[in-house]
Every structure is written in C-alpha cells, then in structure tokens.
C-alpha cells in the first residue's frame, strides 16, 4: 500500500478552495478511487507522516523535502507546476523525487480561451450590456470588429490546453501556429517571438509560469500584433502588466480576453470587491474579463476528473 498525504490547508494554492478537516469531497473521492492501493492522510504539509511516499499538493519547502526520506513522488493536482515547487526540489537536492501533474481541466481551459477570443473580437460584452438597457443602435451603426476566419493566430504552448485551442481555431478557419520551447531549449527571447508572430491577429498564452516565461510577453512582443487580440488563460505573470494595459488603453491592441490576473482575493470579504489588476483594466471597454474560471474549479464534473487522474497516477505508482 502506498502512503499518501493530501496537503490541504484551505489555501486556494493547494487542492480545494475551502478544504475541510473531514468530509472533503476530494478526500472522499480519492479514498473511493484508490483506497485499495493507498492509505491517505490529509492536512497541512507539516502534518505529513514520516513514512509518506507520495505527496499530493503544490507547496512544500526544501527543508520539508529533505526530511521526508521516503517521499518519491509529488503529484500536483492541477495543470501547471508551481515555480516555487521546482525551486524547492532543486534546493533540497532530492534528485530522487519525481513531480507529476494532471490535465483534468484542459478542455475547460481551452473553451474559456475560445470564448474570450470570440467575445473580444466581436465586442460581445459591450453589445450585451447595451441591449440589456434596450439599446439596439449597435446593430445599425458601424462598429469595430475583427474577423477570425482567414486570419492568423499563434498559440504559445503546445501542451494539453494549447493543442486543444489550436484545433478549435483551425475549425474557425484560422491559420494557426503553436509554439513550444525553442528548438535549442532554454527560453524564448522577445525578438525570437516577434519574428514568429509578427503580422498575426491573435496571440493566445497557454504556457506554465516558470522563471523563463515570467514577463515573456512584453511590449515588444505585443507590438508584433498591432491592432490584434491577446488572450491569456495561463498565468498573469507571463505578461508585463503595464505593457499590456498601455497598449489596450491607447488602442495599439484591438482587444484582450483575460481569465488570469495579478491580484487574487485572499479572503471571502475581498471576493466581493477586489480589482483584479494593479492597473484599471476594468475601465477598458476592449477587455473581456473573467475571474479565473477557465480551470472549472469547484465544478463537480471537473473535480471528479481531477480525482480520477490523480488516482490513475497512484495506480501506476503502485504497480
């Protein structure tokens, strides 16, 4: 039997957004799906059993890793592997620890990317708002729009999410290029990206946040799609916030669709009144905004898939 610890503290960065001391749906699902091959404990990481072999979670410091002599696998129960986790494993010098992650919400994330793109290209949010007030004039007036059919899009990221986005864009009649890591490894430099995306209409970010992707999409990159559309469904920090805001506010970019943000509420009270950026994106009509819902957090079907994919990894480890 595997000894497994689910790191649950109620922190949105762990597993569920409101993990409880007992009866948590994720814990119950894991016991149902893998209780025959694993024993489970759950709670903050500092309550991890001494003989724990598998940790399910995303936040652990080097000292905890160094002390966990029997730990051989960390399963990150979402798509992106946290940058701090990679740094902690490296600092602990535990080269025997494998990091695994899952893609249970790839379809959901891809769908929100396509929805944001279409809404941004056609000004759907503004049209909706005006018609709710009884205003039909946009139907009869010239209005700014961008047609996707026949235009060119670049998807930054070739993973489970990026590949789904690319297939959907092709179905919309777009010419699509997906970019993974540079051929020689390492990181993309801005001038390299510019040469690949220059003259296109759409840039969609679907990459993990790592040291080499932080701030990757800067003003130079955004200027390569003049009057274009930028969509971000991965991590806000892959973009230079000021560069994006400035180009949206002065019209150098036609529009943006954003599901990820620089400021996330940390309390229930903040959830009711918390601007998502350090700049007032909420004041821009050419920005379509959603509150980090692409991953489907809390949706029963998505959470069930999360548990099933984690259980599948555990079964692989148990063989």
Predicted region positions:
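Short acidic low-complexity segments
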Residues: 40-51, 63-65, 185-200
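Phosphate/diphosphate ligand-binding glycine-rich loop within oxidoreductases
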Residues: 53-132
